[in-house]
Amino acid sequence: MKSKFIVPVLKPESYLRKILSTPQGILYIGKYPIKDLEAHILVGDIVSNTLRGNIKIIDYKTRRHINIKPIINEPLTNLVNPRGTMSLMSRTIAKAKNYRTIIVKGEEDLVTLAYALENEETSIAYGQPDIGVVIIKSNRLKALRILKTFKPDIVVYNKV
């Protein structure tokens, strides 16, 4: 039997999800793996395996269904983050600054906002499926502007 988790989250409005699904930074077009790029925060398994970065946010999946095992050589932790949300636990883990690899049960995309809040200036790299890699420059103020539009919610999560 699967365990159920009650997860406090922040959810973006639907209009914002559409905006955030388009590339928000510089798009490097090319076949995977694109190498010779680096960013402070890497989001996604393929990007985390091929680029250089300080923090890796992964979920052992590509396009939500293909399981892959990235190379992990640093301290890691697990995080429950339901799809389309930023769990409050992601903020706690980002603030702790003890982990270089975060394995997400759910969806990793919005977890990056928690890390952007912790840095005056940061760079984030993520994959744009079938196109390439996006690198965006972010900072605490940009993250706060986005997060202030999110609404608090509770999600019952039973996919762990």
Swiss-Prot record:
Main enzyme class: transferase
Please name the pathway: Cofactor biosynthesis; coenzyme A biosynthesis
Query: EC number(s) of the enzyme?
Result: 2.7.1.237
Task: Give the Gene Ontology MF terms in alphabetical order.
Answer: GTP binding; kinase activity
Query: Per UniProt, which keywords does this protein have?
Result: Coenzyme A biosynthesis, GTP-binding, Kinase, Nucleotide-binding, Transferase
- Ligand binding (GTP): D45, I46, V47, D59, K61, E108, D130
Q: Which reaction does it catalyse?
A: 3'-dephospho-CoA + GTP = GDP + CoA + H(+)
Protein family (similarity comment): Belongs to the GTP-dependent DPCK family.
Q: What does this protein do?
A: Catalyzes the GTP-dependent phosphorylation of the 3'-hydroxyl group of dephosphocoenzyme A to form coenzyme A (CoA).
Q: What is the designated name of this protein?
A: GTP-dependent dephospho-CoA kinase
